[in-house]
């Protein structure tokens, strides 16, 4: 194989390894929603999946409404959203 072909192959492999974790994220679509504290004022500690950081992070949940990217524990968030 020529050096140009090897460079192309190396470039494609590099691109594939960079994009694979994002495209293989098998969690539900709601795991990509931003954290939504809701309108209430109970100030509960909750966790949401941050797709940019690829991890579950803590936020303050007001106790009502919000969205489905809202978990009581980091473990539950990880179990649902990280595949």
Curated annotation (Swiss-Prot):
Gene Ontology molecular-function annotations: serine-type endopeptidase inhibitor activity
Keywords recorded for this protein, A-Z: Disulfide bond, Protease inhibitor, Secreted, Serine protease inhibitor, Signal
Disulfide bonds: 31-81, 40-64, 56-77
Any one Gene Ontology cellular component term annotated for this protein: extracellular space
Subcellular location: Secreted
InterPro entries for the chain: Kunitz_BPTI (IPR002223), Kunitz_BPTI_sf (IPR036880), Prtase_inh_Kunz-CS (IPR020901), TFPI/VKTCI-like (IPR050098)
UniProt note on tissues of expression: Expressed by the venom gland.
Keyword RNA-binding among UniProt keywords: no
Signal sequence interval, chain numbering: 1-24
One Pfam short name: Kunitz_BPTI
UniProt site positions, description: Reactive bond for chymotrypsin: 41-42
Keyword Signal (UniProt): yes
Domain BPTI/Kunitz inhibitor intervals: 31-81
Domain of life: Eukaryota
Family (UniProt): Belongs to the venom Kunitz-type family.
Function field: Serine protease inhibitor that inhibits trypsin, chymotrypsin and elastase, but does not inhibit thrombin.
Protein name, per record: Kunitz-type serine protease inhibitor bungaruskunin
Lineage: Eukaryota, Metazoa, Chordata, Craniata, Vertebrata
């Amino acid at each position: 194989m020529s050096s140009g072909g090897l460079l192309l192959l190396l470039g494609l492999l590099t691109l594939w390894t960079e994009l694979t974790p994002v495209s293989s994220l098998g969690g539900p679509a709601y795991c990509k929603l931003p954290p939504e504290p809701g309108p209430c004022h109970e100030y509960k500690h909750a966790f949401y999946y941050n797709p940019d950081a690829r991890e579950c992070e803590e936020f303050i949940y007001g106790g009502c409404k919000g969205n489905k990217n809202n978990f009581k524990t980091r473990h539950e968030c990880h179990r649902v959203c990280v595949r």
